Structure formats: structure tokens, C-alpha cells
Amino acid sequence: MSTVYDAKSLDEINVHFILCTERTGSSLLCLMLNLHPEIISPSEEPFALYLHSKYHRIVTWTDEDISSYVDDFFLLAEKNMDLYFTQRAIFHAELLANKNLLTYERIVKISYLNFYDSDQKNKSSVRVIVDKQIKYVYHLDKIQHLFPSAKFLLLVRDVRDNIVSKSIRKLNWNKHPFFLAAIWKGAYSRMLALPENNRLILKFEELIQSPESALKKACSFLSLEFSSNMLNTEGVFENYVDSQKEKLDPAFTEKLLAFHSGIRSPLDSKKIGQYKAFLSQRELQIIEGQCQYYLEIVNYELSNKKKTGIIRFSLYQFLAFLYRPFLLMIYLRIPLALKRKLKKRRNKRMSIPV
């Protein structure tokens, strides 16, 4: 049976965001947040931003509008919806059951609440949605316009360790440490420009070494009571994946568990400071010098404060700008109809049903 909401209850659910770059412990933080009975932290999907231009002006939603929204939602999805989202037919039926109260903000909230099956996450007590989306770092003005009451958890990891972790996982187009440092610098320069009363800095290192302290800060910032259940992460991810295994390809499941090995293992502080065995003194000197301002804001110790390699770093900084904010800006400006065509073509190449 579809959940029927009332407008007041939906409007009282707050939407907040985790901002970060890759390999900062965001999957662990989301796992912990989802163990709080009043929080849902969905799998990262940028639908709220990408569907806004087409649907935000609708005042009276029709069955056709809802069908179109569902089609676009699933077509533009970037992650594995079989794993994280309710069945398409159930989602569609729930939107139809709530048709008379829909606004764009409410349909977005209902969409968020359809992440994770109800037998895995009780939605009835959810008061706060915390969306983690790396892309939103580069669209903060639009996100603040969409959600003017949103607060932002800034999850930060020492740029030096972040570089090593990304290199090991072979993330990003360019693996050069200066390019990865420039990605970090570009992301946190945007995040740290947010008003201080509207953001909370959470450090990866504290989340690993003092998780209760970090989570208490996060809960207080979100105006919630801390739940000790948030610390009981052992086996949670494996059990969730196991509950969904009938929907998933075994090879995908194996890759997924391997990729998220970090949240399947006990918290390990050995990954803190691992850069000392990977980065050369010359690389450290340039990275610390170029990221110094932001490293000091978030209280990371530096071995060097001399700015060197400015010209060389500037080249990688320009490449990082093209790779992240510029490409994301271009994609956002592409009309939704063209986004649909591009995604259909991509799915066809990959033999994904559309």
C-alpha cells in the first residue's frame, strides 16, 4: 500500500547536505547517519537539481506530469537504483496517491524518502534528509535557492591523504598529485565560502578516531539528539546488500563490496598520515604551499609554508577547473530533453533498459 503523506508533515522535514570530495569517508558518514531513526541519507543522485528546470513551475500535477517525472528520474539516475531505490511501480503509485498535495519541493522529498526499502529503513519517524552529492559543491548557489533553509556538513580529509587514497583507487581522469590537490582545493574553496553559521566542518580523522564526538557534533548541528545506534556499523552494509542480492548481478555485488571495503571493516586510523610513505618532499612542499590557506582553516599541521611550484601547479589547477566546475556547469545548462537523449544513447551502448 502506498504511503499517503500530509502536506504539513512533508513541509516539516528538513533537507540538509553533505559536501565533500571523493575518498573523504562520506559513505561511512552516510551509513552512520542512516542508523539514526530520524535521518535518511540517500544514495547520491542529483535529480533535485537536474529536474528542477522542467518541473518546478508545475502547480497542479497531473497523472501525465507524474509519469514524466518518474521516467526522467530513472533515466537520469547515476547510481544503481536496484540497490538503493524502491521499485519503480511502487514509487509511481506513491506519487499518484499524493498527487493533490504535490509541489516540486514535496515531490523531491517523497523521492528522497523512497531510497531504501521500508523494511530496511523505517521512514515514519524521519525528520531530516541529509543528501550527499559531490556535484552540488559546484552548484551551491542553485542548491541554496532550492533549499534556502539547508545546512551543510563539510566533510574534509587532509589533502595529502586524500591524494594517496584517490591514487590507490585510481579515481579521476588525471592521477597526478598536483591535479588531485587542485581538485581538493577547488572544492573546499567553494565550501568554506559558505556562512559559518550555516556549515559544520567534520574531519575524516575525527570520524575515524573519535566517531561519537564527531556524530554528536553533527546531530547537534542538525538539531537532533545523538543516537548511540549510529556507532553500530559492523555488518550493516553487508546485510543490506545481502537483502537486495536477488535484484543484483553477482559480479556487480562482488565489485560493490570490494569498493566499499572501508565501511565493512573496523574503523582504522592507520590510513591517517599514510601520505608520508607515498609523497616526496618536493611534492609535499608544493601541495602544502598551494593548499595552505584551506588546510590552516581546518587545522591541519603543515611541514612547510613556503609557496613554490606556482606555475606548475597553476597548470593542474586549470585542468582541474575544466574537469570539474566547467564540465558540470556545461552539463547543467544542457536542456533536459538533450540530457535524456544523451543518457538513452549511453544506456543503449551499455545495454541498460530505458
Give names to the regions the model predicted.
Residues 35, 41, 47, 161, ...:
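Active-site micro-motifs of SAM-dependent methyltransferase domains
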Residues 40-43, 200:
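Conserved catalytic segments around the Walker B and adjacent sensor/switch elements
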Residues 13-14, 24, 135-138, 186, ...:
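Short, conserved clusters of charged catalytic residues that mark active-site
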Residues 117-231, 236-262:
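PAPS-dependent sulfotransferase catalytic domain
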Residues 27-39:
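A conserved segment at the C-terminal end of the G1
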Residues 21:
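P-loop (Walker A) phosphate-binding loop of NTP-binding proteins
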Residues 1-17, 115, 120-123, 192, ...:
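PAPS-dependent sulfotransferases, especially Golgi type II membrane carbohydrate sulfotransferases
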Residues 42-131, 136:
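PAPS-dependent sulfation machinery
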